[in-house]
Design a protein with these regions (language model features):
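Aromatic- and acidic-residue-enriched carbohydrate-binding clefts of CAZyme catalytic domains
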Residues: 1-9, 20-62, 73-76, 86-110
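Substrate-binding groove of N-acetylhexosamine-processing glycoside hydrolases
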Residues: 7, 58-79, 86, 102-410
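Short, small-residue-rich loop/turn micro-motifs
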Residues: 14, 36, 84-86, 178
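Short, ordered loop/turn segments at secondary-structure junctions
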Residues: 15-16, 217
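Homeobox/homeodomain signature
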Residues: 19, 44, 336-340
Length: 410
């Protein structure tokens, strides 16, 4: 109802193959998993004691269909995004003989056709993430004409051009999905999001995409402050509707005027300045900001060497100096609750980033007492919790807090 009143089409989205771990970790559903006892993979590195992918069989389709029966009546949109991305362990467990005989992509495509039949039974048109199909672009030729792939990519150099060309040549309706680049980050990644959005919008126009789906995610706990999404959201709006880039100052003013109803506030520009942190440090790792990576790396035993090979203490200190400089900004937000909350989020992003950089310095330097630095940090966990509850439901908070607490203790 909220969306309908604002002329927004709310498209249902339900993972229907991979990213199903929140079901498959529980005993009643374990038998549906490709690898019920868990799996390991190297790229990207992950070790799990439960599955994340459904078996590509009829039992899984029947279960998914039962979820569609419950879920889809709540949406008026004729579109339905079924996910189907990143089936990490496909071919490692139940489907291994099939994958060895026919290949992963044929097994995947057959299961996709089963999902498509369920979607059409519910009188919806299917959208799905295109990453598996694009592992071999020729696969696009084998897609049903009424399935709509969404080509996603979140870095500045993502090959939207070649991927969009491959799908467009098959006559399929498709969309391009850049990202806000603020997940796995406390600050956002402004240089990355500028390049990523510009590339996506340019290639969407050139190859006749149906549109742009600007995505934001919550990988590993949604630790990014909510307001770090504003600069990418406004830049994306500008590029998709106007097709012309604008400078940072104008984006900042748009945010101040539209979100905070105070054109001279300065908080919009401050959010952009925070998002320049990785650029100031000279750090560029896909899908990561340096402070977040230092605290949450999936392979902490390799982290000191990895950081030492990429960065110097001097470069990390440049990041701290930048954060100290921008944190001195003051805003007249006392009588503006929306701006006040965003300012609290901005300050939390700064302090979480400082904690991450200090941790990185400790790992690559000798003679620095990490416990002393940790003890000097403000009560980040409590602030994170308080701000979360001002924005969001309690669901997910315990998991996010547990991960954050563990990262800060380490």
């Amino acid at each position: 109802q909220y969306c309908q009143e604002r002329f927004i089409e709310l498209v249902p989205n339900l993972n229907s193959f991979g990213h199903f771990e929140r079901w498959l970790r529980h005993k009643p559903y374990k038998q549906l998993a490709e690898c019920p006892e868990g799996f390991r993979r190297d790229d990207p590195f992950m070790v799990r004691d439960h599955g994340s992918v459904l078996k590509p069989n009829q039992n899984s389709l029947d279960f998914i269909d039962s979820l569609y029966d419950e879920y889809l009546p709540h949406f008026s949109s004729k579109k339905f995004n079924v996910g189907l991305d990143e089936p990490w362990e496909l071919g490692q467990g139940w489907s291994k003989p099939k994958v060895e005989k026919h290949g992963k992509h044929k097994v995947y495509l057959k299961h996709l056709e089963g999902i498509l039949s369920l979607v059409e039974k519910h009188d919806k048109s299917m959208e799905f993430w295109a990453d598996v199909i694009l592992e071999n672009p020729e696969n696009a030729q084998h897609l049903p004409s009424h399935a709509s792939p969404i080509i996603w990519g979140y870095e500045g150099d993502h090959p939207f051009s070649s991927q969009a060309k491959s799908v467009a040549e098959c006559g399929l309706n498709f969309s391009l999905a850049p990202g806000t680049a603020n997940w796995r980050s406390f600050s956002g990644r402004w240089e990355t999001v500028r390049k990523n959005l510009h590339s996506a919008c340019t290639n969407a126009d050139e190859y006749g995409a149906e549109g742009i789906l600007l995505t934001t995610w919550g990988d590993c706990g949604n630790h990014q402050p909510w307001s770090t999404m504003y600069p990418p959201l406004f830049l994306g709006s500008q590029l998709t509707w106007r097709g012309k880039d604008v400078n940072d100052e104008k984006i900042g003013t748009f945010i101040d005027r539209t979100v905070f109803h105070s054109p001279a506030l300065g908080l919009g520009q401050a959010l952009i300045d925070l998002a320049k942190l990785d650029q100031i440090i000279g750090f560029n790792l896909p899908n990561n900001s340096l402070p977040w990576f230092a605290l949450f790396s999936a392979q902490p035993e390799k982290l000191p060497q990895h950081l030492a090979e990429q960065l110097s203490v001097h470069e990390l200190q440049n990041g701290l100096d930048w954060l100290n400089k921008i944190s001195s900004e003051n805003f007249s937000s006392e009588n503006n609750p929306n701006a006040k909350l965003a300012e609290l989020e901005w300050k939390l992003g700064i302090d979480l980033s400082i904690a991450g950089i200090n941790h990185a310095i400790c790992m690559i330097s000798k003679g620095i007492n990490s416990s002393k630095i940790a003890n000097n940090q403000p009560p980040l966990k409590k602030r994170f919790q308080d701000i979360w509850l001002q924005r969001a439901r309690i669901g997910g908070l315990h998991e996010a807090l547990s991960l954050l607490e563990k990262a800060l203790q380490n």
